[in-house]
Regions:
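Bacterial N-terminal signal peptides that target proteins for export
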Residues: 1-10
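Bacterial N-terminal signal peptides
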Residues: 9-19
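N-terminal leader/linker segments that initiate helical-solenoid repeat arrays
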Residues: 24-75
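Structural signature of alpha-helical solenoid repeat scaffolds
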Residues: 39-42, 74, 106, 139, ...
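Amphipathic alpha-helical scaffolding segments comprising HEAT/armadillo-like alpha-solenoid repeats
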Residues: 46-59, 78-90, 110-123, 144-168, ...
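Alpha-helix N-cap/helix-start positions at coil->helix boundaries
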Residues: 48, 63-64, 79, 94-96, ...
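Alpha-solenoid helical repeat scaffolds
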Residues: 68, 84, 100, 116, ...
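Cyclophilin-like peptidyl-prolyl cis-trans isomerases
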Residues: 462, 466, 470-474, 485-722
Length: 722
């Protein structure tokens, strides 16, 4: 997810409050549509094709068809659909059609759709559910507007806040309108929004209180801090308490120190403890240092089994201590962190970063008494365990960011830079390792490259040029990204142009997209011509990126060259996906921590569910680790590389829907629109800012306690779909 959504037809108030452990196949009564029409619609979505075929379905006599076609138009995102969607919103007799039209307009994220949504929002005759989707859509449009449209953005955000205030003052405020209004405020960030959000902290509904606090945290508004300090102590809902801690940390509310410390060490819910630990790190109150070290020690002294659930808290404590003890060389903290280094074999970046922030001198000396010994030790670390090498590289890169006041900063930087240079030269070492399984040392190289680049060494261009020729696509992508960060030059242009033909033949598009981005930064005709060569790519994402970059560089409007997706799916694939609609489909995910069950949502995301089911049936996920765990946010998996960059060798289109990201929602991880493949995530807590941005294709209906216990490094044993 780099990471970094919702359902398909109308949501009633009672269903918005649906528990994540309740059956949630469809949030709106679904009227049947023929298989033939569904396949037509889904094929158009999959191909990202907006044409007369889909346009004609928007005027179909059957409102169910119009609803589904409107959703498809929103997913495709072509501005040419806005006129008809706006017409549906303003004039269709069916409420469900108008709701979906509003949702779809918001998905297009174009200012051209704003007037229709504003009219619906301000209408005195429109239903609250349609107006709720209108306020949601306006929030998306406001968030997507460029800085040049600041005046228009302010107009939209003001209308959003006014509408939310009016709804709050009504005799019976609509639950869904309030929730979607809060998220719209979060996205549009109107002036004085903190006052409105603070009023919602008194709401009787826990979800509304939690979402209001979430919005206050993300906007860093202090208006409700007094109330939030009390909620942190007394609210019965853990999501409210956790979000209260987040706000108090984000706004650096020093008066809340005692309450945050109590929550960090004694709250019964790990999500609250984690949020409070993070908040204490931002307050930078030295009183927290010893208390958190004591708390961390109390966990690690329990002699826990490998990969315990408590690992998540240990890593959060380590991160906090790195901030609180920065440059203080506290021996107690360093000794505790050293135990973590041994336990994780240096593979936890949180521990490595904390250690180097507290004592860069001691960190560097820990790898050897002299530079040659340390260089060889780190080469061996990278070769044997790329995760360890990558984590150490991040820590070495941190030394480049030391305050200028550090007395021996120059010596520390010189030492760290030479160690990173040695790690990049691991192939030239005489270290020979015999291993039955591939070590994939190259997976750690991108972090080493990024760390090395942070020192701005004299040979950086030469080093990046060399790595542009590596076999690993992610290494080449990283080298291209870093070249793009350097001042534009003819030499950089030449290297990037030379690297383009190979990237155009890759199965994965990471390198070519990075090369195109960096070419665009060169701002010269040679680079622009090279970008134009990718307009003929068979990869829709590459063509789309090339068109966007050329437009930004004023090198021409080639929008007509984007075309449609050359999809992998056949008619049989579409029929198989459609056949699951209306049926209960579940996946049992067995991990090293136990099993949890997902109710898949083929009604909402048929092709995403089909892709997941097909991968699972092939055993694709067997043995893959949870490579990313962010407590109180998500657990993420599905990357065969394990570094967050891997996938199945193809991408699928987003099937964004109206299903909200409640606790236990299952979504597709992305690095941009339509970039999903095999990586997916499960949310620990509601994440409304993800709604309408990432495909929700399932919900955990049992075993959420297993999800809560998962840590980075846990493994998938099997996934069975039935």
């Amino acid at each position: 997810m780099q990471i970094r959504v919702k359902s398909l037809i109308t949501i009633t108030i009672c269903l918005v409050a649906l528990s994540p452990l309740t059956s949630a196949q469809s949030l709106r009564p679904r009227r049947s549509i023929s298989t033939a029409i569904l396949v037509r619609i889904i094929r158009a979505e999959d191909e990202r094709r907006w044409d007369g075929n889909l346009l004609s379905l928007l005027t179909n006599r059957d409102p169910a068809v119009r609803v589904r076609a409107a959703l498809a138009a929103g997913r495709i995102g072509n501005e040419g659909s806005l006129a008809e969607l706006s017409n549906l919103l303003g004039h269709d007799e069916d409420q469900a059609v108008r709701e979906m039209a509003a949702f779809a307009i918001g998905e297009v994220e174009s200012l051209s759709g704003a007037n229709a949504l504003l009219a619906a929002l301000k209408s005195s005759t429109e239903t609250r559910l349609v107006r709720a989707r209108a306020i949601e859509g306006l929030g998306k449009i406001a968030a997507a507007l460029p800085k040049e449209q600041q005046a228009r953005s302010a107009e939209i955000s003001t209308a959003i806040l006014e509408a939310l205030n009016l709804e709050m003052q009504s005799q019976s405020p609509n639950h869904q309108f309030i929730l979607l209004g809060i998220t719209a405020v979060l996205r549009s960030r109107p002036a004085n929004a903190g006052q409105t959000l603070t009023l919602l902290l008194d709401n009787k509904d826990a979800r509304i209180r939690a979402d209001a606090a979430n919005a206050l945290a993300r906007t860093r508004a202090k208006d409700g801090n007094n109330k939030l300090a009390n909620l942190l102590e007394s609210d019965p809902d853990p999501d409210v308490r956790a979000n209260a801690a987040r706000v108090l940390g984000a706004t650096e509310e020093k008066s809340a120190f005692e309450k945050l410390l109590a929550s960090a060490t004694h709250d019964e819910d790990a999500r609250v403890r984690v949020s409070a630990i993070r908040a204490l790190a931002t307050l930078k109150d030295p009183r927290a240092s010893e208390a958190l070290l004591k708390y961390g020690t109390s966990i690690t002294e329990r002699h826990l089994k490998p990969l315990p659930a408590e690992q998540n808290e240990v890593l959060e404590v380590a991160t906090a201590l790195g901030r609180l003890y920065a440059m203080k060389a506290d021996s107690g903290a360093l000794d505790w962190l050293h135990e973590g280094q041994v336990e994780f074999d240096h593979s936890a970046p949180e521990v490595e970063l904390a250690y180097v922030r507290i004592s860069p001198d001691r960190y560097l000396s820990s790898f050897g008494s002299d530079q040659a010994t340390a260089q060889r030790a780190l080469q061996e670390k990278l070769i044997l365990n790329w995760r360890s090498g990558a984590s150490i590289a991040q820590a070495l890169g941190e030394i480049a960011n030391l305050p200028t006041a550090v007395e021996n900063k120059s010596d520390l930087m010189s030492s760290a830079e030479s160690l990173l240079r040695a790690m990049l030269n691991y192939k030239s070492s005489d270290i020979k390792i015999k291993s039955i399984l591939p070590l994939h040392t190259e997976y750690g190289v991108p972090e080493v490259l990024r760390a090395y680049a942070s020192y701005k060494p004299k040979d950086l261009v030469e080093v990046l040029s060399t790595h542009l020729e590596e076999d690993d696509v992610v290494v080449r992508a990283t080298a291209a990204d870093l070249l793009g960060d350097l001042p534009a030059s003819q030499e950089n242009t030449r290297m990037l142009v030379a690297a383009l033909p190979r990237a155009q033949k890759d199965n994965l598009n990471d390198a070519i997209l990075s090369i195109l981005d960096s070419l665009a930064k060169q701002k010269n005709s040679v680079a622009n011509e090279a970008i134009k060569s990718s307009l003929d790519s068979t990869d829709y994402l590459v063509r789309r990126r090339a068109v966007a970059l050329l437009k930004t560089n004023s090198a021409g409007n080639f929008s007509s060259r984007i075309g449609t997706v050359h999809t992998r799916n056949t008619n049989a694939d579409y029929k198989r996906a459609v056949a699951r609609i209306g049926k209960r489909v579940r996946a049992v995910v067995t991990t090293t921590k136990g099993s949890f069950t997902i109710e898949l949502l083929p009604d909402e995301a048929p092709l995403t569910v089909d892709n997941f089911a097909e991968l699972a049936s092939r055993g694709y996920y067997r043995g893959i680790t949870f490579h990313r765990v962010v407590p109180n946010f998500v657990v993420q998996l599905g990357d065969p590389r394990g570094d967050g960059s891997g996938g199945p060798g193809y991408t699928i289109r987003c099937e964004v829907n109206e299903v909200p990201y409640d606790r236990g929602a299952v979504g597709m991880a992305l690095s941009g629109k339509d970039t999903g493949g095999s990586q997916w995530f499960v949310t620990h807590a509601p994440q409304p800012h993800l709604d309408g941005g990432y495909t929700v294709f399932g919900r955990v209906v049992s075993g959420m306690n297993v999800v809560d216990s998962i840590v980075r490094g846990d493994i998938i044993r099997s996934i069975t779909v039935r």
